[in-house]
Regions:
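Elongated, amphipathic alpha-helical interaction scaffolds
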Residues: 1-315
């Protein structure tokens, strides 16, 4: 949740999910990540799919309930078959992310397996005892599931990229341990991605340059351009810029000038730098945390939530 003012409270997950639900944007992201920007996945072929992959696992006498809900899931007809495409939005580094995504994919396969087994049982068409016991006929096949994790954080991802990065493996066992490599995209390190959709290109380009403080580049590209206020809201949400979010909300449903918003962003950055310096200096001199929090609230006109967020970030 980003609390920008007394009246504006923005839920990050909701903003990002709404942005990616658009088929053209969703398809462009997957094409850029999986197919080097080639138009393989067609927006018109995408359908909404159930995001809830939760399941009940039964192992012997033990039963375990697992819950997994992806942010956005689409089904796509690829050739003559179907592909399930999942998207996970991540604001912070997560040191268990490969395992989380692997479990999500596995639950997706389990869900389809159980649906097929249920249908087979109802129809009762078995060619062998083995098919009956497994609930799965020899010719039955699951559809591939591809999940992408988009990391929106300002820090470079220094967590694991694959399951084996999370394991302590003796050298001799490494070649025989099954791995799971996640499809991770970092917004701040996304220059190599070839986007075709202008909305996706704008969000990644502006957010990346804000993270890297390349304000001059943003001014050069967007000086004469206005962007949709929805994109401004997404960019402000990704970069956690309260001024940019407020600027976008004031023009809801309209267009906004990025250069004007950029000036507000610079001013916000200057104020944050002052707050950071004050907090760190006060901590160095042994000033009580609660006194510092009260002081920045009073000096910079912050509400309690904003002051607490700065304290958490810089104390």
């Amino acid at each position: 949740m980003i609390n920008t003012s007394g009246k504006n409270k923005i839920k990050t997950d909701t903003v990002l999910k709404n942005f990616w639900r658009d088929n053209a944007r969703f398809a462009d992201l997957f094409n850029a990540v999986l197919f080097n920007g080639d138009n393989v996945i067609k927006p018109e072929a995408l359908e909404e799919a159930d995001t809830d992959l939760s399941a009940i696992l039964k192992i012997g006498s033990h039963t375990e309930t697992l819950q997994k809900i992806l942010d956005v899931v689409k089904k796509s007809a690829y050739g003559v078959d179907l592909v399930i495409l999942g998207l996970e939005n991540q604001q912070h580094i997560h040191f268990g992310m490969p395992l989380r995504l692997m479990v999500g994919d596995a639950l997706g396969y389990l869900k389809e397996y159980e649906e097929i087994a249920k249908k087979n049982k109802e129809e009762g068409h078995w060619d062998s005892t083995e098919e009956f016991l497994s609930g799965f006929r020899r010719e039955d096949r699951l559809h591939p599931m591809v999940t992408i994790c988009v990391y929106y954080g300002e820090k470079v991802w220094d967590g694991p990229f694959s399951l084996t990065d999370m394991l302590s493996i003796p050298e001799k066992l490494k070649p025989i341990v099954n791995d799971y490599k996640m499809n991770l995209i970092q917004v701040r390190e996304s220059e190599q991605l070839r986007f075709q959709n202008p909305d996706v290109q704008t969000v990644f380009d502006v957010s990346r340059n804000i993270f890297k403080k390349n304000y001059g580049r943003i001014e050069d590209i967007y000086r004469e351009q206005e962007i949709d206020s929805e994109l401004g809201l997404v960019i402000g949400t990704i970069t956690e810029s309260k001024e940019l979010i407020n600027h976008a909300l004031e023009r809801k449903g309209g267009r906004m000038n990025m250069c004007t918003a950029l000036e507000e962003l610079k001013n916000e950055g200057i104020q944050e730098g002052k707050i950071e310096g004050y907090i760190e200096a006060s901590k160095g001199f042994g000033v009580a945390r609660e006194l510092v929090e009260e002081k920045i609230q009073e000096t910079y006109g912050l509400n309690a939530e904003q002051a607490a967020a700065y304290m958490k970030k810089y104390w």
